[in-house]
């Protein structure tokens, strides 16, 4: 009786995580880009969304790890679960780096850009921010790929 519950919960949590990543990349980011705000304001709004998402997403990832382990304990460990277990720390690292490093640094640069004393100083902060945003987008795509792999592995255990 516990095996199907653990497995179903495991797959649902992997799907919820993947769905959240897809929604953020394909809905939230383009919607923020369409707003008539300057980039610094957009980054500030994204930081607020990111802090809120971190609470929900962090809980989702923690439960995903617990139920992935429960799935293996209750129904046996196989290659798909071992592969998923190898990807989960990578996923946790990507998420932590994205929020802790990119999110905070982008918010700091946006705030510095808004509070700049000169146009030249603002332009310098804007260049740094755009460079960091490009790197952040690359990390987001890796996160999406790893999240898709985790979902596929969870569904095939």
Task: Tell where the protein language model's regions lie, with residue ranges.
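Polytopic transmembrane helical bundles with strong interfacial aromatic enrichment
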Residues: 1-157
């Amino acid at each position: 009786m516990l095996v199907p519950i653990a497995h179903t919960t495991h797959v649902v949590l992997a799907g919820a995580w993947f769905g959240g990543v897809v929604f953020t990349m394909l809905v939230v980011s383009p919607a923020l880009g369409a707003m008539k705000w300057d980039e610094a304001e957009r980054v500030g709004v994204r930081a607020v969304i990111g802090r809120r998402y971190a609470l929900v997403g962090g809980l989702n990832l923690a439960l995903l790890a617990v139920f992935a382990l429960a799935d293996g304990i209750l129904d046996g460990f196989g290659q798909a679960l071992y592969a998923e277990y190898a990807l989960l720390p990578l996923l946790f690292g990507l998420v932590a780096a994205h929020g802790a490093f990119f999110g905070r640094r982008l918010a700091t640069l946006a705030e510095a850009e808004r509070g700049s004393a000169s146009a030249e100083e603002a332009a310098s902060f804007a260049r740094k921010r755009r460079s960091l945003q490009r790197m952040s987008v690359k990390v987001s795509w890796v996160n999406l790929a790893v999240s898709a792999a985790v979902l596929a592995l969870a569904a095939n255990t």
